[in-house]
Design a protein with these regions (language model features):
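Conserved beta/loop motifs at nucleotide-recognition and modification sites
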Residues: 1-348
Length: 348
């Protein structure tokens, strides 16, 4: 039980530091939403363990729904060729949902694991969920495997990383513009890599401007929904309707749009309460656990255009529509979403 209650799961930095010091584990479980860093860790393992030109013999990649534990065992037990160790990666095998025979095979492998092998279970598309009721498997993994969580990076690390990426492309970017990029494109490095490349290629000058980002970046859902809500608050229904139409053209599910809209409306409500109560941007940032004050500033600015009563009613109506979408059959969800937006624009 003590292992399940540890304060902090090791992340990329701990893994990287250990690898740099020469410490390589035998079994890893990689999980978390920052798949860019997860792949970076796999690349570092490959560079350390697998000699160039011998990947076919010493680096075994396994994946697929039909993958069996027997295949994993065979790959793990395969002897290295012209190298001291082998690397085996297994993608999206849900260890705690294996049948009893497969779990038994995994426990047996972990109990007598070849020292020359490093086995990595990669949770890319599925979440990593343990099950304490499976005591033998839980104990075997606790004894043999290292769990590494690749979580979203903090604001300071992202700022430095974004600047390095742009610098590699011969461009500069200031802190405020980085904040705008993260607000627009999200905070996951995996999604930021292609956006940074696209923006750097588009920008004509040596320094990236917000206009460069707005011109070519693909905003994440939350950013698009904020623009839609901001347009409603500014009484610009045409722009709000255009934002919604664009989301629907992109085949975003109405229920996902409504969920994001509900969150934005709640944030807008608290921003209005902050204004009425004499609270500042930092109060709002801390309340919503935002990484920077940039989105909080945008919310406060938008909230100045609406009344508290409007915010309260908007949140209530959103909750009602959410319940209806989830409970009523054959609902015209797109039509109801458009109608809801019109109602928001019509009541101030």
């Amino acid at each position: 039980m003590a292992k399940e209650k540890k304060e902090k799961t090791p992340g990329y930095e701990e893994f990287h530091d250990a690898l740099q010091s020469g410490t390589v584990g035998n079994v890893y479980i990689f999980h978390g939403e920052e798949t860019y860093l997860m792949q970076q860790a796999v690349t570092e393992l490959q560079a350390r363990l697998v000699p160039a030109g011998f990947e076919e013999f010493n680096y075994h990649r396994l994946a697929g729904k039909g993958l069996t534990m027997q295949e994993v065992v065979e790959a793990a037990e395969a002897m290295p060729m012209m190298a001291e160790r082998t690397l085996v990666t297994v993608e999206d095998m849900d260890l705690f949902r294996l049948d009893e025979a497969q779990r038994g095979a995994l426990v047996a492998l972990l109990g007598d694991f070849p020292e020359y092998c490093t086995l990595v279970f990669l949770y890319r598309q599925i979440p990593y969920k343990t099950d304490a009721k499976l005591k033998k498997l839980t104990a075997a993994l606790a004894e043999r495997a290292q769990v590494i969580e690749f979580a979203q990076q903090g604001q300071q690390k992202l700022q430095k990383w974004v600047r390095r990426r742009f610098a590699a492309a011969g461009k500069e970017i200031d802190a405020v513009t980085v904040d705008h990029l993260l607000f627009t494109c999200g905070s996951l490095m995996t999604g930021l890599v292609p956006e940074i490349a696209k923006i750097a290629a588009y920008a004509r000058g040596p320094k990236i401007a917000m206009a460069d980002i707005d011109a070519v970046a693909d905003p994440v859902l939350d950013a698009r929904v904020f623009d839609m809500t901001d347009a409603v608050a500014a009484r610009d229904y045409d722009k709000a309707a255009e934002c919604l139409a664009e989301l629907l053209r992109m085949q975003e599910e109405p229920i996902r749009i409504l969920a994001a809209l509900g969150k934005t409306l709640r944030q807008l409500y608290t921003a209005r309460l902050a204004i009425d109560g004499g609270k500042d941007v930092l109060w709002l940032k801390d309340l919503w656990r935002m990484k920077s004050d940039y989105p909080a500033k945008k919310l406060m600015q938008s909230a100045r255009g609406v009344r508290r009563s409007w915010c309260r009613e908007a949140v209530k109506r959103c909750q009602t529509l959410d319940h209806r979408m989830k409970s009523e059959r054959n609902m015209d969800s797109e039509g109801e979403l458009k109608l809801f937006l019109m109602e928001l624009a019509g009541v101030k």
